[in-house]
Amino acid sequence: MSTLTPILSSPGWELLESLQARLESQPMPLRELGAALRASGVEAELAAAVVTQLALRQAARKKFGPVATHMVFTRDGLEQATRLVVAARHAQRFRASGATRVADLGCGIGGDALAIAGLGLDVLAVDIDPDAAGAVAANLRDFEGAQVRLGDVMDVDVEELAGEGVDAIFADPARRTGASRGSARITNPEQWSPPLSTVLGWARTIERVGVKVAPGIAYDFIPADWHAQWVSVGGDLVEASLWSPALAPEGRGRSCLLLALSLLHICPFL
């Protein structure tokens, strides 16, 4: 059973939220908290699930700040998640382009979907991992215009998406081996899931397409009329992404986005 299952419904959810509030005012080691829960009669499985989630929320503060205390995570999902400050920049692109309903394909725990929904856009979040789908559903629980779908992005029919009112896509292809995006990185974009060429081809049907790629992507894989942007947060290179012309007001080419606590700087590549 997934460690998420016990906390995604009553009484697990209420227990998680009450303990989160208590820890904010009365911090204590999570190991001690787990022992106290079991001693009070809480089932071991539920106690473990709650403590695991509280630990993930603590770790997630580096990427999501205080918002993390209201979110649900998986270990793999947190590792792969877009930092909230970067996801906010993605969401701003979609809103500025006039998009109204964005499909977040390969959404993971929903960092980008959350930022998109937070700007008032409808979002369809799709992931093949049941744990990730459960997490993103919890994370989007306050947004009426958000929908979560469990499914393989490789099976997506973009014409059907367009028929559902989707007018923009953000994709995060799986770039690691293993069922849970395990250990080994896949460097060839045509071996990603879905392949980069497939994602780029979606723009023939839905013109607004953004895709998260490996920062070390070879320039040969970047379409001449798309915009590639590398993002640094606090001096660390954290991601690269490609944007179709409809999502790139800066035009084709390459740039880097430098984000810090009080500084935003964009430098174009010649």
Range-by-range predicted roles:
Residues 265-269:
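Conserved small/polar residues in nucleotide/adenosyl-binding loops
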Residues 236-263:
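Core SAM-dependent methyltransferase catalytic element
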Residues 98-108:
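Conserved class I S-adenosyl-L-methionine
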Residues 109-121:
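Conserved SAM-binding loop of SAM-dependent methyltransferases across substrates and taxa
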Residues 122-127:
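Conserved SAM-binding motif I beta-strand of class I
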Residues 1-100, 128-167:
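S-adenosyl-L-methionine
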Residues 165-240:
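S-adenosylmethionine
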